[in-house]
Amino acid sequence: MTKEVIVESFELDHTIVKAPYVRLISEEFGPKGDVITNFDVRLVQPNQNSIETAGLHTIEHLLAKLIRQRIDGMIDCSPFGCRTGFHLIMWGEHSSTEIAKVIKSSLEEIADGISWEDVPGTTIESCGNYKDHSLFAAKEWAKLILSQGISDQAFERHLV
């Protein structure tokens, strides 16, 4: 018999969310009391827009560095297959507001303060698809996302 599972992201009604936002998906508690928080970092409106792979790939590499510079406990930040944002997995309890501020600050640096030399993991040795990057696209997307504001709520706009 196959175990029945529910994947939260497939239960989310993508037609009523209002991107850009940060949403707490879940807090998971380990057997020894460890807490892991999972966030939906939605940068563009689902089914209306998507970030092309080169820009998203560069944003991914930059967020891997910039988030860790701003907050402790980041485990992983991985892009959604639909290319509308990222899953952010963190050790410990964190609020959507706290994470939204970190994302906003990180995007501000991408938009205004990053040069190609600042992008980590862009060589054949350090990246599995090193030719598929675009700092230009990453900067343009960061500017567009910031112009719309980052919300700490998914279903109504509450900007941080």
UniProtKB/Swiss-Prot annotation:
<dbReference type="Pfam" id="PF02664">
    <property type="entry name" value="LuxS"/>
</dbReference>
<keyword id="KW-0673">Quorum sensing</keyword>
<feature type="binding site">
    <location>
        <position position="57"/>
    </location>
    <ligand>
        <name>Fe cation</name>
    </ligand>
</feature>
<keyword id="KW-0456">Lyase</keyword>
<dbReference type="InterPro" id="IPR037005">
    <property type="entry name" value="LuxS_sf"/>
</dbReference>
<keyword id="KW-0408">Iron</keyword>
<comment type="subunit">
    <text>Homodimer.</text>
</comment>
<protein>
    <recommendedName>
        <fullName>S-ribosylhomocysteine lyase</fullName>
        <ecNumber>4.4.1.21</ecNumber>
    </recommendedName>
</protein>
<comment type="similarity">
    <text>Belongs to the LuxS family.</text>
</comment>
<comment type="function">
    <text>Involved in the synthesis of autoinducer 2 (AI-2) which is secreted by bacteria and is used to communicate both the cell density and the metabolic potential of the environment. The regulation of gene expression in response to changes in cell density is called quorum sensing. Catalyzes the transformation of S-ribosylhomocysteine (RHC) to homocysteine (HC) and 4,5-dihydroxy-2,3-pentadione (DPD).</text>
</comment>
<dbReference type="GO" id="GO:0009372">
    <property type="term" value="P:quorum sensing"/>
</dbReference>
<dbReference type="GO" id="GO:0043768">
    <property type="term" value="F:S-ribosylhomocysteine lyase activity"/>
</dbReference>
<dbReference type="InterPro" id="IPR003815">
    <property type="entry name" value="S-ribosylhomocysteinase"/>
</dbReference>
<feature type="binding site">
    <location>
        <position position="127"/>
    </location>
    <ligand>
        <name>Fe cation</name>
    </ligand>
</feature>
<feature type="binding site">
    <location>
        <position position="61"/>
    </location>
    <ligand>
        <name>Fe cation</name>
    </ligand>
</feature>
<keyword id="KW-0479">Metal-binding</keyword>
<dbReference type="GO" id="GO:0005506">
    <property type="term" value="F:iron ion binding"/>
</dbReference>
<keyword id="KW-0071">Autoinducer synthesis</keyword>
<dbReference type="InterPro" id="IPR011249">
    <property type="entry name" value="Metalloenz_LuxS/M16"/>
</dbReference>
